[in-house]
């Protein structure tokens, strides 16, 4: 049984993420308990909404330290959408300090002719870490589902695992560092490709459990 703690911090509906994880064979547990994060085999941090309320909710529930400890200790971690953005230090969207786990900032798309903001709908990924386990078994340029006006800009470009292009702007769509992965798109809303990404994440968790 692969137990995955899905962090509840009142930032979006967690049902879709849980359903996706269940579909690929994991046992998700929605929780805001630091003890549950410690006991789980892996952690998923989803989220929809704005940067400042999100980090305030994380801190008011005393989840910042447990999240940082889990990542530092090598527990597999998947951030989704807002759950990617709040890992960064700052955001152009708000005033609060982010969790600061990934050096860098969150920036807003520039307005330009022919594009809409938010970037919403299906778009192609371009892999910059093509051999990463998260992408195993996917086509070279898979379509996934996005809804966002802001994107992450890591100081270390080597952390970028995939990019997406909106108009003339090519931005980070996923990051990977050790056992931390986080994506701007919604795998749970990305049909077959999204389920494959979730399955790859769960498979890596299971492999780790076998050797530990």
Curated annotation (Swiss-Prot):
The molecular function GO annotations come to: glutaminase activity; imidazoleglycerol-phosphate synthase activity; lyase activity
Q: What is its main location?
A: cytoplasm
Q: Which Pfam families match?
A: GATase (PF00117)
**Which pairs of positions does the record mark as disulfide bonds?**
none
Active-site residues, Swiss-Prot/TrEMBL: 81 (nucleophile), 186, 188
Subcellular location(s): the record lists: Cytoplasm
Q: Which Gene3D superfamilies match?
A: 3.40.50.880
Pathway as given in its UniProt record: Amino-acid biosynthesis; L-histidine biosynthesis; L-histidine from 5-phospho-alpha-D-ribose 1-diphosphate: step 5/9
Question: Which reaction(s) does the protein catalyse, per the Swiss-Prot or TrEMBL entry?
Answer: 5-[(5-phospho-1-deoxy-D-ribulos-1-ylimino)methylamino]-1-(5-phospho-beta-D-ribosyl)imidazole-4-carboxamide + L-glutamine = D-erythro-1-(imidazol-4-yl)glycerol 3-phosphate + 5-amino-1-(5-phospho-beta-D-ribosyl)imidazole-4-carboxamide + L-glutamate + H(+); L-glutamine + H2O = L-glutamate + NH4(+)
Query: GO terms for CC?
Result: cytoplasm
Top-level taxon of the source organism: Bacteria
Q: Which UniProt keywords apply?
A: Amino-acid biosynthesis, Cytoplasm, Glutamine amidotransferase, Histidine biosynthesis, Hydrolase, Lyase
EC numbers, comma separated:
4.3.2.10, 3.5.1.2
Q: Where in the numbering of this chain does the Glutamine amidotransferase type-1 domain appear?
A: 3-211
- In Gene Ontology terms, what is a biological process of this protein? L-histidine biosynthetic process
What biological function has been recorded for the protein in this entry? IGPS catalyzes the conversion of PRFAR and glutamine to IGP, AICAR and glutamate. The HisH subunit catalyzes the hydrolysis of glutamine to glutamate and ammonia as part of the synthesis of IGP and AICAR. The resulting ammonia molecule is channeled to the active site of HisF.
Quaternary structure per UniProt?
Answer: Heterodimer of HisH and HisF.
Name of the protein: Imidazole glycerol phosphate synthase subunit HisH
Native source organism of the sequence:
Microcystis aeruginosa (strain NIES-843 / IAM M-2473)
